[in-house]
Amino acid sequence: LQTEKAYKDLASQTADIFNFAVSSSDMPEVMRTALQNDVYLFSGLKTHAQLFEASRLLLDESGGLKPYSAFANDFNKVNKNYNQTYLNTEYEYAVNAAQMAAKWTEFSDGDRYNLQYRTAGDNRVRDSHTRLNGTTLPKSDPFWDLYYAPNGWNCRCNVVEVLKDKYPLSDSKKVIAEGEKATTQIGKSGKNQLEIFRFNPGKQKLIFPPGHPYGKVVGASKVAKFLNINK
C-alpha cells in the first residue's frame, strides 16, 4: 500500500504541472474535468514508463548488478530525459491542446461559419503544416477529426472560425491527404511516429495523443486500470 501511495503521489505531482496548462484556458466544466482526467492518466503512464526504464538499468550487459555509481549515472540521464527534455515538450503541447480543446467548444454548429486552419506564419513552421495553411471546411468535415491542431510536438498551428461567404471551401479529400503526409514519419522500427497526433482534443476531450508510447510500455494497462480506480 505504501508503494502504491508513493506511485500515485509521483503521478499526481506530474499531473499538477500539466494541469496548469488546462487551467490557463476558459472552457466548460465538463470539458475541464475530462481533460484533467486525461492529464492524470497520462502522468501515471509517464511515471510508469520512467520507472520501468530505470528498472532495466540495474543490470549490466552480462546480467550482473551494476555498481551504484554506474546505475546512478544512467538513472540521472533517464531522469533528465523524462523530467526536463520530455516534460518541457509535453507541457508546451498540453498548453496548445488545452487551448484548442477550449476553442472547439466555442465553435458554432450553425450555417454561418466554417473553420480554417492557420499556421504561425513564420520560418519555424514545418513545410507539411504550411501545406495545410488556409484549409477551410465545415466543422462537420472529417478532416477535423484527425488533423485539428496541434499536429505534433511543438506545433503552434491554430484553427479559427471564418464567415462562409468570405473564403472558398477546400477540397476535403486533397487536404486530408496533406494531413496524412503531415502526420507521417517512419521511424527505425518501421512504424509511423506521428500517427498518434491524428485526433481532435476538443471532440475527444483529450489533451494527449491516445496512442502515445507511454501507454504501450509493459504493464501500462494495469497502471491505467489502477489509476482509474484510485482517482
Roles of regions detected by a PLM:
Residues 1-152, 160-231:
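Domain-core detector
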